[in-house]
Amino acid sequence: ILGDRPDLRELHGLPYIYCAAPRRAAGLIAHALVGNPTRRQSIIGITGTNGKTSTAFLTQQILALSRGACANFGTLGYDLGGTWVDAPHTTPFGEDLAALFLEVEKRACSHVVMEVSSHALDQERVAGIAYNVAAFTNLTQDHLDYHLDMETYLRAKLKLFEKVAEELRSENKHGPCFGVVNAED
């Protein structure tokens, strides 16, 4: 068991491994175990208070017409390149995401568009994903029950751009990387 309690050595009779950021570690491990499929795909992450779903669907349609099969993970469900799966979360946890990316790779989807919630960014559910594009739709007063103030909320959203910057600095960079910000709102 991987967790953030340094006082434990075992839990329920199983070995307990302390980790300061267990969700991040679990995501990195899960992606590594399935061969890091996002290193071979173009990953477009879309964040913002409103407009993520519409932007994701429009982007998916453009990519499908110009590049072929394209997956879409978001609020309404997960399109695995023609097969729909119900979505328990807008952005699933790292272990589930790794399995989804592997599945869409098997289905010959070279591009994946995904909504990336501020909760997922804050909770490091997207650790291990090699993003090529970060898109930001807008920021309005929502989810302040979780983030407490607008500054903290914005910092969570900007983590998606930090992930693209990580990819830009990576020795294993796999395609162009850039950010898109909606300046109209």
What does each model-identified segment do?
Residues 1, 29, 46, 73, ...:
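Residue-level signal for inorganic ion chemistry
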Residues 1-45, 55-67:
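Short, basic phosphate-binding NTP loop
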Residues 52:
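Conserved lysine of the Walker
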Residues 83-94, 142-147:
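Flexible beta-alpha connector loops of hexameric P-loop NTPases
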Residues 67-81:
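Short beta-strand-centered segment that lines the nucleotide-binding/catalytic pocket of NTP-utilizing
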Residues 88-117:
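Conserved nucleotide-sensing/catalytic segment adjacent to the nucleotide-binding pocket
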Residues 3, 7-13, 122, 131-185:
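Acidic, Mg2+-coordinating active-site environments of NTP-dependent enzymes
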Residues 16-18, 43, 70-72, 134, ...:
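Conserved beta-strand scaffold positions in the cores of enzyme catalytic domains, especially
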